[in-house]
Every structure is written in C-alpha cells, then in structure tokens.
Amino acid sequence: MKVIASAPAKVILFGEHSVVYGKPAIAAAIDLRTFVEAELIREKKIRIEAHDIKVPGLTVSFSENEIYFETDYGKAAEVLSYVREAINLVLEEADKKNVGIKVSITSQIPVGAGLGSSAAVAVATIGAVSKLLGLELSKEEIAKMGHKTELLVQGASSGIDPTVSAIGGFIFYEKGKFEHLPFMELPIVVGYTGSSGPTKELVAMVRKRYEEMPELIVPILEAMGKVVEKAKDVILSNVDKEEKFERLGVLMNINHGLLDALGVSTKKLSELVYAARVAGALGAKITGAGGGGCMYALAPNKQREVATAIRIAGGTPMITEISREGLKIEEVIK
C-alpha cells in the first residue's frame, strides 16, 4: 500500500513580531506544496528519500582546485529531522514499533525562506503515514502533532505554521488560540531575497529596543495589533472583492512601515517591496521575521508584472494564491 499526501506553505499576512507581545496575527496557506509518499516496506526500518528539497540561491565559489559551497545545506538536512520526528509520533500514536516505512519527499517550497517548509513536510508526513497505518486523525489532531514535531526539533513553536498547513485558508491567531476566517481569493506574488533572516536575533533585537525605549516601541506594537484587527474586519466585511483588495493593500503598506520602524527590514526587502508597488501591487510587505527571507505583494490582475519587477530587483518571484485546502490525501494505491 502507498499513500501520497500534500500540505501547503504559509505566509504571515499581518502581525509578525507584534504577535510575540500578545497581539493577534493573520496567516494563510498558499498554493506551494510539499508532497510526501509513504509506503510499507519489508525491512523493519524507516527510509527517507528527499528527491527535491529546494534550497534557493545556490552560491558556489572556485579557488584554484577547490570548490566552496556557500549555501547552507544544513537547512535541507534539517527538514529530515522533522520527517523523522513526525514518523515517530505517528508510530507511537498507532502503537506500532516494528514496522518498515519508506517516505519520499518532493517540495515546491523553498527551505529557510520563512514560508513554513518544515511545518508543511511534518504535516504531509503525518497525514501520509497515519493514513498508511489506518489511523483516522482529524486535521486539528494532525496540526497538534505537527506542532509537537516542531517543539521536538526546534524547542519552541507558536503552532501557527502547522495549524495553517493542516487546515488551510486563513487563520486568525491570538494568545495561543486559533480562529478559522472565511475564505477569500488573494492574488499574491511572494518575493524571496535569496537569504534567510536570523529569526532569533531579530526577535532579540526588537525585545532590546522594547526594553530600552518602551515609550516608542509599545505604540508601534499597539498599532500593529490594530492593523491585524482591521484586516480581520475587512476579511469578514460584506464589501465587494475589489474594495477588500484596496483596503487590505493599504493595511499591508502600513504594516510594512511599522515593521521597518522596528528595524527588521533590509535594503533588499525594501527594494522588492517598492518594486512590487511601482509595478502595480495594491500593497506589499515583509512576511515573517524580516532580515532576509520573503516579502509578498497583493497584485490583482498584475501578478505577472509584479513578478517581473521582483525578478528585475534581484528577487525570486513565486506567483501563487491562497490555498483553501490544507492537508490533502492526494492518492491511495492499494
């Protein structure tokens, strides 16, 4: 028997950094997916094959007879840790120890870009292996197991990434609680800078500024929280689609300005954001921790133009949409 499952990437639409201080955030699944194929094998071992784990921005240097790989391949290897822990959790849940499983991974999600590649591979693995072993788990249960996988591998996790990846659509997150928002189409373009931001260092930097200058930083964080609430109101409102796009675009630009004020933007991120806006995006902002990683732009009827502008500005564009579905069982072959 063989099972193929897939799980989507995510973007933080609004509220990164301020979420650390108890403010809400909105995240959404996007149509870039990780596919995991799981099958039972005779050998009593776990075999993991990674056919296509994307590590964008490959840099190679040549010096006399030596070749230096400058890209961090540790990030690709780290993905395998999530797969291993996810399989172990499912085996534990199914109470099956001496079983042989082969897992094959292919992915459209770049690793280390802040798009939730680790959560997607964990969720898809849990989905495929649990189905293979006859475990009937709800998407909420799979999200919780995905969260547990992240905690085991990285030691800390809000649970946003695996929840979005398992359930799909829009998720409103506040103080550890999740609310599924109604689905709406968002024609977006994600732009990758080619390098990942140092999340821990950036969070620590914001914390330092918060402690040193609370009278300046607290109002910024409060404003960010209000942007998220306003964005939620727009998504829930009955205004037409075009009006929603306009309002969300304005809120994206405000949120980006506030993130810039915190000091988490970079020259490259700003170049991609402004290139997207000039090309016709209604809004563009950092998604994730900043310091590198990705931005995204809301570009109804302008996705190709915005993608071209991002490429010319030195980024890697990915034209995508919000994914209504989270985890999907693509195929079961008996």
Swiss-Prot record:
Superkingdom classification of source: Archaea
GO molecular function, one term: ATP binding
Keyword Lipid metabolism tagged: yes
GO aspect biological process, one term: isopentenyl diphosphate biosynthetic process, mevalonate pathway
Localisation: Cytoplasm
Catalytic activity: (R)-mevalonate + ATP = (R)-5-phosphomevalonate + ADP + H(+)
Predominant place of localization: cytoplasm
Name used for this protein in its record: Mevalonate kinase
Name of the gene this protein is made from: mvk
